[in-house]
């Protein structure tokens, strides 16, 4: 049966654990799985600029024995002279999977509605599930079991990382806190979905406007840019409300002594995170970036093996 990965709760807790275990295996033995030998192809479409997503998917697909057909979405007929469902039918005849970094989540859903190969969300305005798989792999490397850990996110609670951390974190059995200024809290429908999943895993979701409450005793501190792609024009207006949510040495001191600090990058040093924290011993940012490669390879292997 064809499976898609459009948002973090598309994987059950057991399935998420399987992907993370496979990611660890592929990090140890990068060329041990070759499901794309042939070479077989994967469409990798970018409607938004990318560094880590492009490099990690291109290299990962090559290590799996395949060929990445990388396309700028603006140079195709996607959603313009051809409908997304029609495009999905066509691409499904050419490639073994479709990886898409785009805008609205509805575009991914339209693509997946008729695709006969797996569709993977490489980032949308609402979710960033591949990044959170890499985050969970990184936390596992530093702290062991994920279940019961306290993860706190600081910044724009309405952005894709906050949404995905809630869904992915509670799927892993973590207690997730979103610390954001008033007016920047997560989509209530995503909070509801996370709470529903949390009921099955013993996890919890908490929203707060107090960064120090969120940091107290936390095992993981996560932040992201205060201004997401497409919001650059109002970047200066965001500095004042977000300044109390900067991940700095004061917040770090309130957290657990073995706290792990994550940032999906690119980082605006001195805004959402200080140099001292980002370059300090608690930071796992560079391992986190590398793990995009391993987590995404594992996801592709998992999806492809279930679709055959």
UniProtKB/Swiss-Prot annotation:
Pathway assignment: Amino-acid biosynthesis; L-arginine biosynthesis; L-arginine from L-ornithine and carbamoyl phosphate: step 1/3
E.C. number(s) listed in UniProt: 2.1.3.3
Described purpose of this protein according to its UniProt entry: Reversibly catalyzes the transfer of the carbamoyl group from carbamoyl phosphate (CP) to the N(epsilon) atom of ornithine (ORN) to produce L-citrulline.
Cellular component, GO, one term: cytoplasm
Keyword rRNA processing: no
Compartments reported by the entry: Cytoplasm
Catalytic activity of the protein: carbamoyl phosphate + L-ornithine = L-citrulline + phosphate + H(+)
Cross-referenced PROSITE patterns: CARBAMOYLTRANSFERASE
Entry binding sites for carbamoyl phosphate: 50-53, 77, 101, 128-131, 264-265, 292
Protein name: Ornithine carbamoyltransferase
Record's keyword terms, sorted: Amino-acid biosynthesis, Arginine biosynthesis, Cytoplasm, Transferase
Family statement: Belongs to the aspartate/ornithine carbamoyltransferase superfamily. OTCase family.
Subcellular location, principal: cytoplasm
GO biological process terms, semicolon-separated: arginine biosynthetic process via ornithine; citrulline biosynthetic process; L-arginine biosynthetic process
Pfam families tied to this protein: OTCace, OTCace_N
Gene3D superfamilies named among the record's database cross-references: Aspartate/ornithine carbamoyltransferase (3.40.50.1370)
Positions of L-ornithine binding: 160, 224, 228-229
GO molecular function, one term: amino acid binding
């Amino acid at each position: 049966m064809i499976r898609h990965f459009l948002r973090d709760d598309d994987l059950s807790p057991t399935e998420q654990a399987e992907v993370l275990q496979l990611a660890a295996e592929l990090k140890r033995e990068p060329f041990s799985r070759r499901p794309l030998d042939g070479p077989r192809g994967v469409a990798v479409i970018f409607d938004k600029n990318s560094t880590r997503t492009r490099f990690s998917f291109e290299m990962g697909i090559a290590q799996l024995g395949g060929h990445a057909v990388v396309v700028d979405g603006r140079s195709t007929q996607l959603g313009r002279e051809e409908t997304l469902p029609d495009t999905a039918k066509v691409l499904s005849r050419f490639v073994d999977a479709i990886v898409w970094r785009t805008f609205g989540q509805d575009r991914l859903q339209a693509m997946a509605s008729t695709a006969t190969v797996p569709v993977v969300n490489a980032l949308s305005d609402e979710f960033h599930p591949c990044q959170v798989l890499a985050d969970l792999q990184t936390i596992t490397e530093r702290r062991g079991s994920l279940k019961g850990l306290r993860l706190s996110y600081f910044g724009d609670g309405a952005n894709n990382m906050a949404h995905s951390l809630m869904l992915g974190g509670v799927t892993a059995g973590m207690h997730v806190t979103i610390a954001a200024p008033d007016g920047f809290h997560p989509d209530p429908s995503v909070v509801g979905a996370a709470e529903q999943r949390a009921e099955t895993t013993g996890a919890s979701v908490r929203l707060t406007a107090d960064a120090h409450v969120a940091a107290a005793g936390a095992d993981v501190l996560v932040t992201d840019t205060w201004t997401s792609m497409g919001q650059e024009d109002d970047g200066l207006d965001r500095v004042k409300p977000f300044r109390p949510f900067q991940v700095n040495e004061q917040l770090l001191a309130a957290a657990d002594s073995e706290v792990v600090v994550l940032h999906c990058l690119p980082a605006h040093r001195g805004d959402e995170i200080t140099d001292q924290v980002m370059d300090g011993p608690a930071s796992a940012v560079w391992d986190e970036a590398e793990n995009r490669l391993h987590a995404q390879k594992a996801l592709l292997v998992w999806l492809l093996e279930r679709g055959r």
